[in-house]
Amino acid sequence: VDAAAFTKPLLLRFGDRVLLMSATILDPPTYLASLGLDPDEVAVVRAPSTFPPERRPVRLRPVARLTRHHLEADLPKLAAAVVELMRRHPQEKGVVHAHSYRIARAIEVAVPADLRGRLRTHHDASGRDAALAAHLDDPGPTVLLTPSMTEGIDLAMDASRWQAICKVPWPFLGDPQVAARRARDPDWYAWRTCLTVVQAYGRSVRSADDAAVTYL
């Protein structure tokens, strides 16, 4: 649903001043356009993060081309990189944002027997909550392998000390709504992609005294 047509009648009409707060606005012009707001009627106030950068480092590790034409050939490279990260963090819980069930399955089958017991994963949406609960309830260094938990979950402190974002999460252009919104506003497509990355990044560091490393 495009919220722009509903923002004023359903939200803004309840007050003379409205405060919208978010850690993931990212690009104010695109955000305002998505809500149908006139930039001349909005004041944008930026506040610095209270989370120290040294406690939430990002490591860039390009290892595979996961576009449609290269996915099949390069999936083993990605899986090998995830296995290496599991070995690098033998005593720490982590989360692997796989982007799709196909990628998640390829990683799952590539994990060697000595590490497979650490994996907590699901093969469709119905298993999502059970996989998350299995990860959180296990005191051991489990690794949550999922394509669908970039937002809405809290992996604070020891629930995740490292995470991997396996692929740039471009929205699926086969979705008619996505295709129509990109055609109308190309900036929205890039903004939505960056938003998903930032949301995934935020799953593991939940407070100023938390810490986790993110691999891209």
Where are these regions (language model features)?
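A contiguous, basic/glycine-rich beta-loop/short-helix subdomain that forms a polymer-engagement track
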Residues: V1-R65, A125-R128, L132-A134, T142-P147
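Conserved interdomain hinge at the start of the Helicase C-terminal
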Residues: P9-R13, L60-H99
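Short glycine-/polar-rich loops that comprise or flank the Walker A/P-loop
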Residues: F14-D16, P39-V42, E54-P57, E92, ...
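Conserved RecA-like ASCE P-loop NTPase motor core of nucleic-acid helicases/translocases
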Residues: V18-A23, E92-I103, Y215-L216
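A short beta-strand-to-loop transition that corresponds to the Sensor-1 phosphate-sensing loop
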Residues: M21-I25, H99-Y101, T146-M149, C166-V168
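Phosphate- and divalent-cation-binding pockets in alpha/beta enzyme and binding domains
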Residues: P28-T30, I103-I107, D154
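Conserved RecA-like P-loop NTPase helicase motor core
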Residues: P62-A73, H123-L216
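Conserved helicase motor "Helicase C" RecA-like lobe of SF1/SF2 P-loop NTPases
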Residues: G94-D124
